[in-house]
């Protein structure tokens, strides 16, 4: 059995108002997986993944990255676990596409040659090379999402988390984003996609997990989990007899 890339152990997160967002989550991620994580609004999905690279601190319990607590290796965790937020524009930090992607590597104090190499490779991977001098806010929603992916790729992560990556995108933007996610998995990245839109992506997943009330309630192969999702307020793609391999917007 492969060692776990990521583990949560009795993970609890309680907000200052007493609301418990995570309620003792025990969960594992193995390198190379493509996980779809779904659940109703407020079930704890985004709070959970923000613990994976130390953006949040647990109230109790811990997150282990390759067997070591995330909070003992924060810089390494933030390089290893990349995250593309639901609002891609919130990740824009610079005045040009090139400088935006360069921001992360610059903070690693890499050489200018290495930074330039990473930026150009990352922009090429997401198809934005010809836009490197453009202002990020002039990009379309789909292009901004690809820019956020490029910024993550420049950090050379092992795992990439996408939080509702299809929200607010038109058909072309969804297809471009999904193509990018699938390609990243094929290139060896571990992928976790938070989404309500199972019909857009489930065909590519190796695992489907459902959260409710701060814990993982269902976890397994997509074909084993799918028939139970509506018990946890997740819409099952219709018709009910639809094959999982058809649940993609790629053709």
Annotate the PLM regions:
Residues 61-69, 77:
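Conserved ABC transporter NBD signature motif
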């Amino acid at each position: 059995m492969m060692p776990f890339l990521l583990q949560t152990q009795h993970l609890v997160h309680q907000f200052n108002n007493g609301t418990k967002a995570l309620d003792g989550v025990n969960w594992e991620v193995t390198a190379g997986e493509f996980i779809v994580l779904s659940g109703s609004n407020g079930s704890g999905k985004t709070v959970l993944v923000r613990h994976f690279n130390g953006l949040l601190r647990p109230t109790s319990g811990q997150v282990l990255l390759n067997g070591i607590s995330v909070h003992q290796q924060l810089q390494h965790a933030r390089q290893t676990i990349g995250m593309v937020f639901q609002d891609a524009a919130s990740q824009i930090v610079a005045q040009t596409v090139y400088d935006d992607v360069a921001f992360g590597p610059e903070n690693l104090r890499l050489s200018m040659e290495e930074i330039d190499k990473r930026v150009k490779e990352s922009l090429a991977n997401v198809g934005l090379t010809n836009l490197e001098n453009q202002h990020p806010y002039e990009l379309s929603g789909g292009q901004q999402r690809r820019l956020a992916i490029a910024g993550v790729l420049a950090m050379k992560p092992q795992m990439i988390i996408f939080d509702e990556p299809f929200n607010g995108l038109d058909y072309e933007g969804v297809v471009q984003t999904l193509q990018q996610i699938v390609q990243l998995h094929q290139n060896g990245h571990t992928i976790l996609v938070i989404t309500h839109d199972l019909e857009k992506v489930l065909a590519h997943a190796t695992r489907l997990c459902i959260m409710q009330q701060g814990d993982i309630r269902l976890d397994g192969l997509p074909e084993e989990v799918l028939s139970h999702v509506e018990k946890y307020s997740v819409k099952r793609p219709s018709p009910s007899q639809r094959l999982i391999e058809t649940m993609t917007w790629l053709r």
